[in-house]
Each structure stands twice: as structure tokens, then as C-alpha cells.
Regions:
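A "functional boundary" signal
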Residues: 4-8, 15-253
Length: 253
């Protein structure tokens, strides 16, 4: 189910957002979603076409630097779409990073592998993978990804923990890495707003989260993927608040 939601957020929602859905009724939006689902093969074909083009560019690349870049783009295309393939390209990134002898490339590839492990439920393996990264030498631009993975993995471990003691400890670690993310991301960035909204909902401050997300959504410079992330997070805030109408509307928006 988690994979289906991720695919919906990354593929289907951006298609709807292209048409300026801000003022449409929920029923109208849901009818559009029905149409999107009926034509899901079309959107899947578009995804596969992008992947095919990237694979062609990868095969024609003349340097390991170029190959690393194309493998990174293929990993991005495959994440939440085909986890086996995303792991393959994370491994290829790691091999190329070794040839290039670039530590930040090695760290990024290792985190890609940890991301796939965490998504497939291999939480301890993901933490072991992250534990091999030397935080002291980590490049500044990788810190948000690093903290995000720890926060996400510990959060999932908390969700599925058997004992209350384990659950409490995992959620404590989730809070620590959430706070680290808030300190790392720029205060006016999408990442900061999403993490802050997450923190608000955890502490039952639903209206504060909704206001924050709604204000950020109105920014004219947002791309469709960013809008999709915000509207999905808004739907979750409304769900936790117990507002089914709001949840339904923003899940459709």
C-alpha cells in the first residue's frame, strides 16, 4: 500500500496539478482522478519512455562522470516505481564513485542503497549502511538527505515496533533527526516546511500544520511535484485532525 501511495504522489498527482486545480470542487477533482486511473497505462508508458531515453544516454556516455550522472537520474526515475531497478542503479553509482574516487559520490550512492533498503522493510540493514558513512567528512549538500533517511527509517521502525519500549525509543530517535533536519534545511525551503508540518502533526497541532502548508502552496514558483508533496501532506494533516472532507479534497487536489 505504501508503494501505491508513493507512485500516486510522484506520477498521478503532478498530472492533475498541471491544470490549475486550486479552485475546483472535490467531486470534479475525483472525476479527473478516475480518468487518470483509467488511462494509467498512458502515464506508465510516458515514464518508461523517459527511462528508455536515459538508458540510451547512459550507453552513449563517454566518461564515468557522465555515467554517474545518468545513473543518478535513473535512480530518481525508478524510486517508488521499481525498487529492484533503483537498487541496481544505486550500486552502479557506487562502482562509478569508486572509480572516480569521490567521497561525496560514494556517500550519496550509499544513501541511495539505504533508501531502497528502508523502503523494502530492511530497516536494520539500512541503518548499517548509513552507519558506514563518516558524518564528519559528509558534504554539506548531503546532510538533509542523510538526516531525512534516519528520520524516515526510525519512524517506520516505530510504526512497526512490537513493544511499547521499542516504539518509544524509535520515535525518540525520529524526533532527534527531525530536529536535525529543521536545523539543516533553509527556513524558506519546501523541505523545512514539510518537516515542520510533520512535527506539528505529531504534536497534534493540526491547524498550525495546515496553515503553514497552505501558505507555502500559494507560492507561484512551485513546480508540480512540490505541489503534489504539499497537497498529500495536507491531506494527511486533515486525516489526523479527523476532517474527512478536507482529507478527501486535498488528496484529490
Amino acid at each position: 500500500m505504501r508503494k501505491i501511495i508513493l507512485i500516486f504522489v510522484t506520477i498521478v498527482l503532478p498530472c492533475l496539478l498541471c491544470a490549475r486545480n486550486d479552485d475546483k470542487s472535490t467531486d470534479m477533482l475525483l472525476r479527473e482522478i478516475d480518468g487518470i486511473i483509467r488511462n494509467r497505462q498512458t502515464y506508465g508508458a510516458e515514464k518508461e519512455a523517459r527511462i528508455s531515453d536515459l538508458k540510451k544516454l547512459l550507453s552513449e556516455a563517454t566518461s564515468d562522470e557522465q555515467r554517474y550522472g545518468f545513473c543518478g537520474r535513473l535512480f530518481d526515475e525508478y524510486r517508488a516505481y521499481n525498487l529492484d531497478s533503483s537498487y541496481v542503479y544505486a550500486q552502479r553509482k557506487q562502482e562509478l564513485a569508486s572509480h572516480l574516487n569521490k567521497q561525496d559520490y560514494l556517500d550519496d550512492a550509499a544513501m541511495n542503497m539505504a533508501e531502497v533498503m528502508g523502503t523494502t522493510g530492511m530497516y536494520k540493514e539500512a541503518l548499517e549502511q548509513l552507519g558506514q558513512i563518516d558524518k564528519k567528512t559528509l558534504s554539506d549538500y548531503l546532510y538533509p538527505y542523510y538526516y531525512h533517511l534516519y528520520r524516515t527509517i526510525y519512524g517506520l521502525m516505530g510504526d512497526y515496533a512490537v513493544t511499547e519500549k521499542e516504539k518509544k525509543e524509535y520515535y525518540r530517535m525520529t524526533d532527534l533527526y527531525r530536529d536535525s533536519l529543521l536545523q539543516t534545511n533553509a527556513s524558506d525551503s519546501l523541505g523545512h516546511v514539510l518537516v515542520m508540518a510533520d512535527k506539528c502533526t505529531v504534536h497534534a497541532q493540526y491547524d498550525q500544520a495546515i496553515t503553514m502548508l497552505t501558505d507555502f502552496y500559494r507560492k507561484p514558483s512551485l513546480d508540480d511535484h512540490s505541489k503534489a508533496m504539499i497537497t498529500y501532506t495536507l491531506s494527511e494533516a486533515y486525516r489526523l485532525k479527523g476532517d474527512k472532507k478536507g482529507q478527501k479534497h486535498f488528496l484529490a487536489l
